[in-house]
């Protein structure tokens, strides 16, 4: 009898430890680079449906391809409402029709969830099923919006407050603000760069945009950018092309660049008019994060980076 009780207690303890580990741990998502230089990861949605997810922060809602959404509506468990008027969403200059909207929660792992608005886009399938803004992802244990982006090992983790407290302290820190189009996360800093032997500085507010595969986009419609270009006519501005050879904007080749007091060599600073509603001076892209570890504490408005 005693042996049975001990066995039962051991089983209960193992079960409780398993539950504790699931509720207090973190999910690790392995990132893969697609052909356009962006990052995706695969996970099981709501513990049952596999999905390929596009890593983003330059959007304000979750996006789902229409075909994927309706083929898997039962597993997604969302009430999609058809849009009453013609609506489009501009993603990097390409516009998609918004067919339906929903509000809800999507479980991305044992300890990770997305809560908020969800847009269904027509013909959005481009090697992924959905896109998720990291600022809307939280830990299921305490609801913390703390995202660790490890671009040394290409991993994404969602931390709770306790896990974050055990992180190394050798980070640089800058304040995140949301004074942007659609409240996207941004930082106020100086862009300093060297071009043709001369040094230039542009102060501004820059969106932290993980959907931008480049180093930096400057917004051509922004008054500060316009003044900067007008006052520095000696800058050699070249036509920028995508991988297919199609012109997509203009660019400045910088021998050296400094952004958020972080130094870089040989970077392309793109200038675009494809995002006319953006109000910031620019968007910081993925090449800023290459080979380093960053932590976004969206609750405390802090961006920690190495």
Regions flagged by a language model, labelled:
Residues 1-26:
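Bacterial Sec-dependent N-terminal signal peptides
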Residues 21-306:
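Pepsin/retropepsin-fold aspartyl endopeptidases
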């Amino acid at each position: 009898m005693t042996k049975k009780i001990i066995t039962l207690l051991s089983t209960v303890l193992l079960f409780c430890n398993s539950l504790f580990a699931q509720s207090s741990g973190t999910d690790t998502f392995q990132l893969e680079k697609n052909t356009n230089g962006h990052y995706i990861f695969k996970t099981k949605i709501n513990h049952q449906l596999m999905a390929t997810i596009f890593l983003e922060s330059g959007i304000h809602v979750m996006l789902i391809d229409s075909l994927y959404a309706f083929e898997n509506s039962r597993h997604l468990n969302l009430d999609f409402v058809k849009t009453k008027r013609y609506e489009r969403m501009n993603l990097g200059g390409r516009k998609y029709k918004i067919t339906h909207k929903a509000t809800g929660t999507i479980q991305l792992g044992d300890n990770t969830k997305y809560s908020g608005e969800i847009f269904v886009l027509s013909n959005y399938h481009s090697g992924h099923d959905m896109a998720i803004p990291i600022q809307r992802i939280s830990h299921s244990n305490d609801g913390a919006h703390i995202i660790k982006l490890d671009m040394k090992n290409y991993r994404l983790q969602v931390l709770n407050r306790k896990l974050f407290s055990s992180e190394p302290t050798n980070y640089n820190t800058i304040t995140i603000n949301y004074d942007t189009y659609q409240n996207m996360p941004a930082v106020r800093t100086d862009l300093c760069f060297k071009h043709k032997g001369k040094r230039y500085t542009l102060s501004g507010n820059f969106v932290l945009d993980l959907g931008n595969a480049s180093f930096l986009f400057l917004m051509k419609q922004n008054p500060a950018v316009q003044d900067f270009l007008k006052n520095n006519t000696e800058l050699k501005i070249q036509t920028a092309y995508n991988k297919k050879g199609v012109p997509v904007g203009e660019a400045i080749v910088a021998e050296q660049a400094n952004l958020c007091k972080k130094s870089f060599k040989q970077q392309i600073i793109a200038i675009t008019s494809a995002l006319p509603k953006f109000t910031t001076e620019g968007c910081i892209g993925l090449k800023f994060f290459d080979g380093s570890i960053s932590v976004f504490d969206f609750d405390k408005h802090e961006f920690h980076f190495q």
